[in-house]
Amino acid sequence: EMCIRDSTYPKPIICWGHGIVMGGGLGVMAGCSHRVVTEATRIAMPEVTIALFPDVGGSWFLNHMPGKSGQFLAITGASINAADAVFTGLADRFIGSEHKATVLEQLRRSAWSDDSAVNHARVRHILRPLTEQSIGSMPGGQVEPHLTVINALCDGDDVHQVVDNIVNQQTSDQWLSRARDGLAHGSPLAALWISRQLQETRHSSLREVFQAELMLATNVVRYPEFAEGVRALLLDKDRNPAWAYKTTREVPAELLEQFFQAPWATNPLGEL
C-alpha cells in the first residue's frame, strides 16, 4: 500500500539511492517521483538466491526495462550500478554524492507552492544542474553494453532454454560470469516462478502487479524452498542450499501452478 501511495503521491518525493539499494529499499525508490543515484549505488534483485522473487513492484519495473534486461536481472540476481539504473529506468538522475548537502540546502531554501506541478518543476530545477556537473563521474554501466548478449541469451523457446543459455554460456566477461553463477547457484524452482510472474504481469497495471505479488509471496513463503534459501544465505551462511530440484526441467508443472493459485477468496489488496 505504501508503494502505491508513493507512486501516486502528488507532492515530490526525492529518493537518494546511495550505497546498497535492494529488496524493499528498491521498491520504495521505484515509486518515488525523483530518483537519484550516485557513484556508490549498487542495485540488485538477488531473490533467486533465497528462493523468493523480486516483489514490491519488481514485476512492474522489470517488465518495463529495455529488451530482455529485466528478465535477465531477475533470474540471475546480477548487480548493477548507477549508469545501469538510469538506463533501465530505475533512476531518473545521476548526481555525485558530494552534492547531497547542496541539494538539501537548496530544497530548504525553496519557496514551495500549493501547485504540485510547480513543486515538481522546482525539484527538477534544483537537480538538473547538479546532474550536468556530475556527468564526468558516472561509472560505466553493464546492461547497455551487454544488451545484445542479454537479448540473445533470453531468446529461448521456453524458460528452460533461457536458463540453459545463461548457465552454459562460456564467457570471460566478469559481469556476465557473475550473473551466470548467480543463476547456477540459485533455486531452479525460484527461476521458474520468477519468469512466470514476469510473463503473467507483462500487461498488468501497477495495482494488479501488487495484488499478484502478494498472492505469489504468500504461497512462496509457505513452501520449504524459501526457508532453505534463507537458512543457507542468512542464518547458517554456508551458502550451500539443498534445493528441492537440481534443474528447472525437474520441477513438476502442477507444483509450479500451485504458486499461482489464490490462497484466499478475496485478495487483501483488492481495494487498492
Indicate residue ranges for each PLM-predicted region.
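Short, small-residue-biased leader/transition segments that mark boundaries at the very start
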Residues: 2-4
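Glycine-rich beta-to-alpha active-site loop
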Residues: 7-50, 72-73, 77-78, 82
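Hydrophobic/aromatic residues within transmembrane alpha-helices
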Residues: 28-29, 84-85, 194, 233
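Gly/Pro- and small hydrophobic-enriched strand-loop and loop-to-helix capping segments
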Residues: 32-55, 89-104
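Contiguous mid-protein beta-loop-alpha structural module that forms a pocket-lining wall or clamp
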Residues: 57, 64-120
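Amphipathic alpha-helical blocks and their helix-capping loop/short-beta junctions
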Residues: 96-183
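Substrate-recognition/cap regions that form aromatic- and gly/pro-loop-enriched pockets
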Residues: 159-170, 175-215, 221, 225-227, ...
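C-terminal amphipathic alpha-helical interaction region
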Residues: 216-219, 224, 228-272
